[in-house]
Structures are given as C-alpha cells and as structure tokens.
C-alpha cells in the first residue's frame, strides 16, 4: 500500500503546462484501494496542487496582458499606491448593424431646414460662416442658465443680462423686506454679495482690497443696505456687461430706444401663422421705447399686418378704443387681432362642414359681387420631371469577337465630264505624253525622254516593249482586246444612246 502511494504522488515542482486531467487520471485507480481517510488526504493534496497551478497560470496571463497593452498601473512615484488591475473580461456588445438609426438622417428637410445644424450643435460642432463645422470644447460652449438661481455665475452663458437682472431683483427685494439686514454694516453687505457669486465674478470681488478700494466708496453712498448693494451691483454690471449704469444711465436709455426704433421699423410679417412669434419680438423692443412715443408704435404694430387684414384690424381697434371696449395699449391691439383670427378659424371650420354635407352652387349668382378680369387663386399642381436614367446593357457573351473596319464612303462624286475615258487611237496627237504630260506627241516621240529626270519612265517603256506590251495609243489587235467597265447613271446612259442614234 505504501509503495503504491509513493508511486502515485506527484512531484513538488510542477511544470507550467501540466494538465489537471492527467493528475486525476493517474490517481483514479489508486484511490479505489485506499481507505476513506487516505482518500481525503490525497484529494486535499491534489486540490492544493490544482490551486497552485491555476494561480501560476493566472499570473502568467496577467503578465502577457501587461506586455501587450502596456498598462500603467500607478502614476505615482511612491510604492504605496494601490495597483489598479485592468479588466480582461470581454463583454458581448450587441451589434447595431441593420437597425434603424435613432435620428432620421434621410428626411427630406433634414439637410436644408437647419435640422442638421441642431444635430451638430448637440455634439459640440458649430457651423462656420465660410462653410463647414468646427469642434469646440464643451467647457467653452455657452449655456443657458436658469434665471431663478440665487447664485450669480456669468461664465460662458448666453443670457448674462437677463440673469443679472433677475439675480439683482431677487436679492434687492430680500434686503428691503427682511428686517434681519437693517443693521448690516458695509463690510457685511460686501461679504453677502461676494457669498452669492461664483466663477469670474467672485474672483473679481475677492481681488478688490476692501480697506482701500471698497470701504471709502461705500461710505459715500447714502441709504441703507439696499443702496450699498445697488452700488456693488452697478460695479459688477459695468465690469461684466460693459455698460456704466451708474454715471451714464440716461445715455444708455437713449441708446436702447434708438436701437428699438430701428428694429421695430424694419420688422415684416407676411404670414399670420407666425403672429405669435411676431408679437414676442415686437413686445421685446416696444418697451425699450420712451413712454411718449409708444402710442405711435401701437398703430405701427397693426399696419405691418398683411393687407387687407391689417387695415381691417386698424379700423376695428380705433372703433373699440373709442367705445372703451379695449385699452389703447399694445395688449389691446394684440387682443383684437387674436379674437379676429379665432373667429375666422371658426367660420372656416363651418365652411368645411357645410361644403362636405350640402352642395351649394354659387357660380353665376347675381347677388354675389362679381369680379371682372380676376382669377381665382388656385394651388399649383406639383409636377415632378422624370429623371432619365442611363440604360445599361449586359455584354453578350455568346457573340464572337469581330474585327471592325473603317467604313467605306459609297457616295460617288460627280465627275465634270461623265462618260467613257478618252481613247487615243493611232495617228492622233491629241493625247498627253506619259513622260512630260504634254499634248501633241506620244511617249516614244517625246523630245525630253533623253533628260535625266525622265530616264526611269523611258526605261520602263522600253522594257514593256521588249516584253511584248503595247501602249494604249496603238491599235488593238483582232485577237486580244482590252475592255474597261465604267459605272454610269441611267440619265447619262440614255443621253449617250440618243447621241449615237
């Protein structure tokens, strides 16, 4: 029993590539012959060995991951830092291929109606004037801050003036109504203002030396804590908004009024569907005007409405203000326009109902005022031109490759003197010489045949005579004849026949 046990035990030093299945295979036979206690001891020892093997394999895998990914566990120079192990688990991330996008990119109006600009702005991109988009860090992108906040932070916001006015009104009202602030000193008012600020505003106030810069100026301000607070607010407003409301308040009011006059005079509305938007913009600049000139711009509000609706509203507004039915204010003008629009919408809904249930023939009715030379406004029918697509042909694989030749020109050019070629019989000297190309003699009688430049032609003629060839000038024999095929038109052939007759 003991000998068998020694043979079964594995060595204390283990190889890295040892498999646990082999260990169980070797010991399964021996365990059958052991007692229960011996089996327990043997299994316990095997489990320890397996744990050592797994720990060693885990450390090896971590070392390989570190070498491959070059993970820095700790950025500190000291050795006390706690090592952060990388996550080696691979999670199954579901694929999004074939799924519908969360944002409908393929809409007809997506690229042209400004939807793409909004989509790009949400992701930190801003459209440039020259075209294209530029990426802006998130911390430098202006945000819209809640105006009900009790903390003043003017860093990178797009509604700084409105936020400043809301913050000033809230704390100013609290200083006036709360009796707790009646006995506040100048230093306590300064600290109170500084406490409810953040960012650049708080840094600006903290950099001020209270004893030399703040205290002397606050001492000159007459009034209670609210007057002191208002002085500090005017300093902040001039620093961050850029307007000196302390010494040049009237000049600022005049500038705002001039800006409002220009804006109201150039506003235009052509569609009453945008009446609410028109009202919001008009009201904003209307109350920047001085109280004396506002009555003129109430009528301008109605005159800018599309004709003849604007003229009708002007008459109704004057009539109702004279009867004291509505107030002679901008609110009264807005009210009469909205009531008229509501009544018109109700009448149109009735017309649709009646038109669908009962047919009314109004054409040709003499009681209806006629319109001479006028045409009814009809909606233009939308037509779409069919796009011509280039037709594609599949190659005919079964056809053999052909050689293409240049096409011959079969069009015949008309000759100046159509007919048979001129034949020069023997005895007549009207044909041209083959050597000098002059009329009056034959080639064998050419006086220029002895010249150097004509020797080649003369030699050719002599060789032809030696071979038995005769020129066309000589008469044809009875045995051999030479024929020439000439293609002629039907008209020319008929004329020649008449001449021969």
From Swiss-Prot:
Residue segments, region Disordered: 78-98
Family designation: Belongs to the caulimoviridae capsid protein family.
Keyword terms of this UniProt record: Capsid protein, Host nucleus, Metal-binding, T=7 icosahedral capsid protein, Viral penetration into host nucleus, Virion, Virus entry into host cell, Zinc, Zinc-finger
Any Gene Ontology biological process: symbiont entry into host cell
Cellular component GO terms held in the UniProt record: host cell; host cell nucleus; T=7 icosahedral viral capsid
Family matches, as Pfam families: Caulimovir_coat_dom (PF22909)
InterPro entries: Caulimo_coat, Znf_CCHC, Znf_CCHC_sf
Protein name: Capsid protein
Top-level taxon in the UniProt lineage: Viruses
Job description of the protein: Self assembles to form an icosahedral capsid, about 50 nm in diameter, nm, composed of 420 subunits of the viral capsid protein. The capsid encapsulates the genomic dsDNA. Following virus entry into host cell, provides nuclear import of the viral genome. Virus particles do not enter the nucleus, but dock at the nuclear membrane through the interaction with host importins.
Places the protein is found: Virion; Host nucleus
Transmembrane segments: none
GO molecular function terms listed in the Swiss-Prot or TrEMBL record: nucleic acid binding; structural molecule activity; zinc ion binding
Subunit structure: Interacts (via nuclear localization signal) with host importin alpha.
Residue numbers covered by motif Nuclear localization signal: 122-125
Zn finger spans (CCHC-type): 431-448
């Amino acid at each position: 029993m003991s000998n068998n046990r020694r043979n079964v035990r594995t060595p204390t030093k283990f190889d890295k590539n040892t498999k646990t299945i082999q260990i169980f295979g070797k010991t399964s036979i021996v365990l059958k012959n052991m007692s229960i206690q011996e089996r327990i001891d043997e299994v316990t020892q095997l489990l320890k060995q397996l744990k050592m093997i797994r720990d060693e394999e885990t450390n090896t895998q971590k070392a390989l991951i570190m070498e491959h990914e070059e993970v820095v566990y700790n950025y500190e120079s000291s050795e006390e830092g706690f090592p952060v192990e990388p996550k080696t688990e691979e999670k199954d991330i579901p694929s999004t291929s074939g799924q519908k996008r969360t944002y409908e990119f393929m809409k007809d109006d997506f690229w042209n109606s400004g939807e793409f600009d909004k989509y790009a702005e949400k992701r930190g991109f801003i459209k440039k004037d020259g075209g294209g988009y530029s990426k802006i860090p998130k911390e430098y992108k202006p945000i819209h801050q809640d105006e009900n906040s009790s903390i003043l932070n003017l860093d990178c916001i797009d509604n700084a003036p409105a936020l400043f006015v809301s913050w000033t009104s809230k704390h100013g009202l609290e200083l006036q109504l709360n009796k707790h602030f009646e006995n506040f000193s100048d230093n306590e008012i300064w600290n109170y203002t500084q406490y409810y600020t953040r960012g650049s505003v708080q840094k600006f106030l903290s950099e001020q030396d209270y004893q030399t810069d703040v205290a002397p100026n606050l001492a000159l301000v007459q009034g209670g804590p609210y007057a002191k607070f208002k002085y500090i607010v005017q300093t902040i407003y001039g620093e961050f908004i850029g307007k000196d409301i302390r010494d040049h308040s009237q000049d600022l009011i005049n500038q705002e009024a001039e800006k409002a006059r220009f804006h109201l005079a150039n506003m235009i509305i052509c569609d009453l569907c945008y009446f609410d938007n028109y009202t919001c913009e008009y009201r904003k600049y209307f109350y920047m005007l001085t109280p004396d000139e506002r009555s003129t711009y109430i009528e301008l509000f109605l005159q800018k409405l599309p004709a003849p609706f604007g003229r009708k509203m002007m008459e109704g507004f004057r009539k109702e203000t004279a009867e004291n039915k509505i107030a002679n204010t901008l609110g009264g003008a807005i009210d009469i326009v909205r009531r008229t629009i509501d009544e018109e919408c109700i009448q149109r809904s009735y017309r649709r109902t009646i038109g669908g249930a009962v047919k009314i023939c109004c054409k040709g009715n003499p009681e209806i005022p006629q319109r001479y030379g006028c045409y009814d406004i009809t909606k233009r029918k939308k037509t779409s031109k069919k796009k011509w697509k280039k037709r594609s042909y599949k190659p005919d694989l079964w056809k053999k490759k052909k050689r293409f030749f240049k096409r011959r020109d079969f069009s015949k050019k008309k000759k100046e003197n159509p007919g048979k070629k001129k034949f020069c019989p023997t005895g007549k000297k009207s044909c041209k010489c083959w050597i000098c190309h002059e009329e009056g003699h034959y080639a064998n009688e050419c006086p220029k045949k002895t010249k150097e430049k004509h020797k080649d032609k003369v030699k050719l003629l002599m060789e032809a005579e030696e071979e038995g060839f005769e020129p066309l000038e000589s008469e044809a024999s009875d045995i051999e004849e030479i024929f020439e095929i000439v293609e002629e038109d039907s008209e020319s052939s008929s004329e020649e026949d008449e001449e021969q007759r």
